[in-house]
Regions:
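Structured beta-strand/loop patches that form or line metal/cofactor-binding pockets in enzymes
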Residues: 1-44, 50-54
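Metal- or metallocofactor-binding catalytic centers and their adjacent structured scaffolds
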Residues: 6, 38-114
Length: 117
């Protein structure tokens, strides 16, 4: 079992080696949100999701707001299984699929590390 102690959210923008042109959209950088989840035993898990209003409908700012909301629902929770992670995140907020995936991947990464899988 793991207990969530801390969740940090990082907003990054990485320049692309080549510009992507899609319809009326030109993409020159990759905007992503990185999520680090730390347990009470100081182990960490990481997750990431890209933000793109033109592809996913989610902006970095919106993802950060959603993650701050989800974060408050998860801090100090005890988690034993991937199923619990999924249920906890799905119940926390409607929509916001990219934001949810970033924190879900971080939690699954952390759970796997604590279970040595």
């Amino acid at each position: 079992m793991l207990k969530i102690k801390e969740i940090t959210i990082h907003n990054i923008a990485l320049p692309l080696q080549e510009t992507i042109r899609m319809s009326k959209v030109i993409i020159e950088k990759s905007n992503s949100i990185l999520v680090k989840v730390k347990s009470t035993d100081d182990m960490s898990g990481w997750g990431e999701a890209a933000s793109s209003l033109s592809m996913t409908g989610e902006s970095s700012a919106g993802m950060i707001l959603a993650l701050e909301y989800i974060k408050n629902e998860i801090i100090n929770k005890e988690i034993e299984s991937v199923g619990e992670i999924y249920e906890l995140i799905q119940r926390s907020i409607y929509g916001n699929y990219a934001a949810k995936s970033a924190i879900e991947v971080a939690l699954v990464d952390l759970l796997a590390k604590t279970q040595k899988k």
